[in-house]
Structure formats: C-alpha cells, structure tokens
Amino acid sequence: MLASPARPTLRMLANHALSTPHCACSPAPAPRTASASRRRCVPVEARAAGVFGDRLAGVFGSRGLKHGGVQAPRPRVVRAEPRAGFAVVRSPRRLCGRSHAPQPPAHLGLGPGCFPAVAVVVPVPGSRAHRPFAALLVEGSFLGDPPIPPRRSGVLARGSAGADCLASSVTPGPSLWIPLLLVAGCVSCFVGLAVCVWMQARVSPAWPAGLFLLPR
C-alpha cells in the first residue's frame, strides 16, 4: 500500500501506538473544513490487538518468524475506528498448514494454505481505562464462526489506518446486554425465592441461615 507524503504511513502509526501510553497522534493533512483540531491517530487498543494476535497465532503454529533471540516484526495497524470502539491489527505471524481453510486472496501476497492473523480489539463497554478484549480473525473469519464474505475480508485487509482521536464510550450491543439481562433475572429469582423461604419459616432464623431452611 502506497501512502502520500502528506499522510502518515501504517508503519509510522503502528510504531507510535506501540511506544506511547494512550493515543499516538500525528498531524493530518491541511484541513478542508473549518475544524483545525482534527488529528489522525491510532488508539491504544491497537497494541493489545497485536499482542493478542501474536500469542494466539503462536498456539496454532506459524511460519516466517526468526528464532535465536531475534525479535519478531511488530504488528501492523490495518484499521482503527475509535468512534466505533474497535481497532484491527494484522499480526506479522501467519497461520499455515490448515488444509480445510479456503485459499487466501491474491492481493494479500500469501502462499497457499497461509493466512494472516488479524486481531479485532473492542474496549470493554463503559470502561475508561482502555482494557480491551479481542478476537482472532483468520482471513476475515472468526474462529468457530461462519466465514465473512470476501468483500468484507478485503475491507479489513486493505482498510486505511487512522481515525479521529476522540474519547467516546462504547454502547453495549445485543451480544453483551442479553447475557447481562439473563444473569440479572436469575439473580433476582434466587433472591426472591430465598426471601420467601426465609419469611415462611416457623422461627425466623438469623440472616443468611434462612436461605438454607425450608418451611415445615
């Protein structure tokens, strides 16, 4: 991917994100609108994405890494969207030897049977401490999930790095608030049943012993 001189390269953004504690911003090109404070940046979640992708890729096995104490290449930022609350980082490791997986697209430049390890990082909803959780992508497909269409995986592979450096919270999606509602319902039912058992006992025992006494 070629970058114009006025736009920071992917390597520059990734190195800044790996060396700064919060958000590494570099000046954007001349603004077209009146807002002169907009910057291009890579959020701190990108660092965790690279670490997560490297470690998980090492579990499944990879090729192309140097051994003997030589440090492996750093992960490359593929896409960062702080407004949407996620960052995509491609790990330098490759997952190889999985014959049942589809062949990688030609534009990725990988050999047959080798796939890029891409980590998607999403910050914990409501957390201001930037403690993200991540999931590994193998050529646009979540492990254990149906494959994402090639058009979507191409967007992830060729996406532009950099996004507006804005502090924003993430709204919990259905995959998060539905389990939370189920847990809250189970807890409320248990508490209600315990209170009923405690109140119906002949001799009101001291709390919380009444939780384990049934009425006679």
From Swiss-Prot:
Residues that span the membrane, as ranges: 177-197
Bilayer topology term: Single-pass membrane protein
Keyword Cytoplasm (UniProt): yes
Subcellular location: Cytoplasm; Membrane
Keywords of the record: Cytoplasm, Membrane, Transmembrane, Transmembrane helix
Disulfide linkage: none
GO terms under cellular component: cytoplasm; membrane
Tissue: Expressed only in testis.
Major subcellular site: cytoplasm
The protein, known as: Putative transmembrane protein RNF32-DT
Organism: Homo sapiens
